[in-house]
Amino acid sequence: MHPLEKFEYCPLCGSHHFETNGATSKKCENCGFEYFMNPSASNVAIIKNVKGEILVERRKQEPAKGMLDLPGGFAQIGETSEEGVCREVMEETGLKVVSAQYLFSLPNVYRYSGIDIHTLDMFYLCEVEDDSALAAGDDAAECMWIKPEDIHTEQFGLRSVRWGLIKFLVRQDRFKSAEEAQK
């Protein structure tokens, strides 16, 4: 189901004449208000320690509860993507990001409360001040360091994180191809 199908009433005037107007919008026949469904901004941190291991988390909540993940989450209103990734890393791991370098973005669909939330996940290579303060918090049940060669992407619950890890590891020459990364 497309997320726009859940919106039956105009959020401006309350009219029931809120009709689909193309693939990404609905328009009110009563007041003329047009609502565009755009992806939500989300941030993902790839953090390596001095041994070259990558920081991963075990998800505490749905979706994909109990599966592996990378630190990250939704951007908040008024913050930059860089501020968002720093905030999420602090909330979920207790670590302070001192550098966040943008890598790439991937689209994703995040099922939450029965609705498919379309996201644009922005991946950052982050450097932290001191990784000895590592402690799981917020959405993370636990945090751990994993050697790149020990990463099995099928253990990660979110599609964009799986593909983001593959893309990152292929770039780092940890895998020769995306197919090898999925083995």
What positions do the PLM features span?
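Short functional micro-motifs and their immediate structural scaffolds
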Residues: 18-19, 36
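Conserved Nudix-box catalytic region and its N-terminal flanking loop in Nudix hydrolases
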Residues: 49-91
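Active-site-adjacent beta-strand/loop module that shapes the phosphate/pyrophosphate-binding cleft
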Residues: 104-132
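Short cysteine-rich clusters marking metal-coordination/redox-active sites
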Residues: 10-13, 28-31
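Short metal-coordination and nucleic-acid-contact micro-motifs, chiefly zinc-binding Cys/His arrays
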Residues: 3-7, 24, 41
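Conserved N-terminal beta-strand and adjoining loop/helix that marks the start
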Residues: 30-54, 74
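Nudix hydrolase/Nudix homology domain
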Residues: 1-6, 133-183
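Short linker/helix segments within small regulatory modules
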Residues: 19-25
